[in-house]
Amino acid sequence: MALALCACGSAQTADTPAADASASGAAAGGAVASGVEDGVLTVAMECAYAPYNWTQTDDSNGAVPISNVPGSYANGYDVMIAKKICEANGWELERVQSDWDSLVPGVQTGTFDAVIAGQSMTAERAEQVDFAGPYFYATIVCVTKANSPYASATGIADLAGGSCTAQIATIWYDQCLPQIEGAKIQTAAETAPAMLMALETDSVDFICTDMPTAQGAVEAYPDMTILDFSGTDGDFQFSDEVRAENVNIGVSVMKGNTVLKDAIDSVLSTMTADDFNALMAQAISVQPLSE
């Protein structure tokens, strides 16, 4: 169980005194508590990032209560993965809602035991937290309207000059969109739903995201279509290392918490890419259309 069952404020950053104290304690050789001594795994997510995670008003399709948002329930691929981890280890699952920018600080300070929220296993994040997994492999794609002139694009060169956005603090916004020649990059979206709404309302011509988010989008918005350039010369260009970091989706835990990391890995290591894809397809099939 985490030290506190509330989301960190968005103003808190990785270099806050609390985070520094936690990091220095681990560096000094002090034992890091697993967080699950009481049999409860407290897991944070946005609860607004379908099909990875979303909020709904009841427990249908296996949704679980959100402990810090009474009357609300979380569901999605991340919830399904968290339930498998808890079932295998004999833990009770406690879900906490947090905004995206507070997820890493929340793990660092012990506010949550783990984050299962569609996080890419980037080198920058790995300096702040430890990762178990991966628990999904997510291709980077673009999404546009089916009737858009960009719908026939076969590579990023065909997106030149278009207006676009992506979610804040992601490789999609920071590294992908700038590769498109003449792109009119708009303000980053705070959440995945806000990113999708920018496209749906024609505020932008296209967005950049990962394949599961895109697949969930076209389920909710049939007028959208996916542009998948992966494996072609027209794809976004990264080093193999950077691409692997941002395709691999992992579970973050406090630095030095090897007990919890190993317990999570013991479950994820038994699952194949086909298992992950089947579970993701299940999540997409039950996501609310409003997401």
Language-model features: locations:
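Bacterial lipoprotein signal-peptidase II cleavage site
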Residues: 8-24
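C-terminal motif of bacterial Sec signal peptides marking the signal peptidase cleavage site
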Residues: 3-7
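Alpha-to-beta junction loops
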Residues: 91-92, 108-117, 162-164, 200-213, ...
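Bilobed "Venus flytrap"/periplasmic-binding protein-like clamshell domains
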Residues: 43, 47-50, 71-87, 119, ...
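A ligand-binding cleft/hinge motif common to bilobed small-molecule-binding domains
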Residues: 102, 117-128, 175-178, 205-245
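Acidic, polar ligand-binding/catalytic clefts
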Residues: 87, 92-158, 237-243
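Extended ligand-binding regions for polar small-molecule ligands
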Residues: 9, 80-88, 148, 162-163, ...
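Extracytoplasmic small-molecule ligand-binding "clamshell" domains
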Residues: 20, 29-118
